[in-house]
């Protein structure tokens, strides 16, 4: 059985307009160029997949326009209406640093629709697993506002669609984007039918978001696990976090399907983080998730593209993920790894271990909720 793959030229042409890094053009001393959230890194990932002839090992899942009722499962009507109106004009800002150009609503709806289609095919066993190379990203978006380049919360919408249609009671979302998925956390914070686990650089973005003490409220207590890593963490920290926290959480929860908010911005050369991951880090995390999924939910894993801003490194990080998903016999080496490893991150330091261990409290609450 083949892995599924969603991508479309229209998604890769999603535009955020001119900018200067993450900054809007409000200072006339900053010379404008591309906004940091442009499509180039994702286009280069797609180009690498084509160059290596991996598309033949993937089942292409076509995008479709998400129905407004699907988006309404998560987002408020007035907010959707504003985005649609601005998109039909000349674009605007969805909120908290989320600029977009004309036709953004149409493009975002295509990405959401494609992810929903992919998720359903994975759940029904029509494809082995799935990767959605979609834009714009989603995990920061809240119910009534955009946030951090994200207009709509793609994974939250897809997960909620599956839950409603197939009466699911245990959906896991693993978020390894280097920035905390504040939107996804808030949406599911009071619920136990979705387990949200985020591993992120401490206090990178958003500010003061993603504390290990934020482990959910009411029915959701123990179903929100934030794993913080300090700046300078790398491969060793992520291995430790996965082995000690993520594996135990998934084994206790026994999800019916696993979504991954698949950001590549923990790369050692990403401009929006200070972590030291490389392609083998993403390979390890993918392999771990796939192995657990085989044991817990018949291999049902859906990866959805989030951040990643290094035009050089994102393609190789994404390639490592796809190679594991399709079980490709060849493993292409990461040409950037040596440069990253030279800076550190391969040894777990005591301060890194101590910070990760703060997440055991949330894990233990989850385990106490699932003593079968």
Where do the language-model regions lie?
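A general "terminal functional-core" signal
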Residues: 1-6, 11-12, 20, 81-372
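Short coil/turn segments at secondary-structure boundaries
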Residues: 33-36, 58, 62, 74, ...
């Amino acid at each position: 059985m083949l892995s599924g793959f969603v991508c479309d030229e229209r998604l890769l042409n999603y535009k955020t307009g001119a900018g200067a890094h993450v900054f809007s053009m409000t200072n006339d001393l900053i010379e404008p160029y591309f906004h940091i959230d442009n499509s180039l890194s994702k286009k280069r990932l797609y180009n690498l997949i084509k160059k290596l002839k991996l598309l033949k090992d993937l089942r292409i899942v076509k995008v479709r326009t998400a129905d407004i009722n699907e988006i309404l499962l998560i987002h408020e009507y007035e907010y959707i209406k504003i985005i649609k109106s601005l998109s039909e004009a000349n674009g605007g800002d969805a909120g908290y640093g989320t600029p977009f150009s004309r036709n953004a609503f149409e493009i975002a709806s295509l990405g959401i629709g494609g992810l929903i289609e992919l998720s359903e095919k994975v759940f029904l066993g029509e494809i082995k697993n799935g990767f959605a190379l979609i834009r714009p990203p989603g995990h920061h978006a809240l119910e009534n506002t955009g946030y951090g380049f994200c207009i709509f919360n793609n994974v939250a919408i897809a997960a909620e669609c599956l839950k409603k249609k197939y009466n699911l009671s245990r959906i896991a979302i693993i978020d390894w984007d280097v920035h905390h998925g504040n939107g996804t956390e808030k949406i599911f914070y009071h619920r136990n039918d979705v387990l949200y686990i985020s591993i992120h650089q401490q206090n990178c973005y958003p500010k003061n978001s993603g504390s290990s003490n934020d482990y959910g409220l009411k029915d959701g207590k123990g179903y929100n696990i934030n794993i913080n890593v300090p700046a300078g963490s790398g491969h060793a920290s992520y291995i430790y976090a996965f082995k000690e926290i993520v594996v135990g959480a998934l084994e206790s929860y026994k999800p019916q399907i696993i979504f991954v908010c698949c950001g590549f911005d923990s790369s050692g050369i990403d401009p929006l983080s200070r972590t030291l991951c490389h392609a083998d880090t993403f390979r390890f995390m993918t392999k771990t998730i796939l192995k657990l999924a085989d044991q817990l939910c018949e291999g049902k894993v859906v990866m959805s593209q989030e951040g990643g801003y290094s035009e050089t490194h994102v393609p190789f990080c994404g390639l490592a993920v796809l190679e594991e998903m399709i079980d490709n016999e060849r493993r292409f080496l990461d040409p950037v790894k040596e440069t990253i490893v030279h800076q550190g991150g391969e040894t777990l330091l005591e301060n890194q271990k101590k910070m990760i261990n703060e997440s055991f409290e949330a894990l233990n609450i989850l385990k106490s909720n699932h003593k079968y």
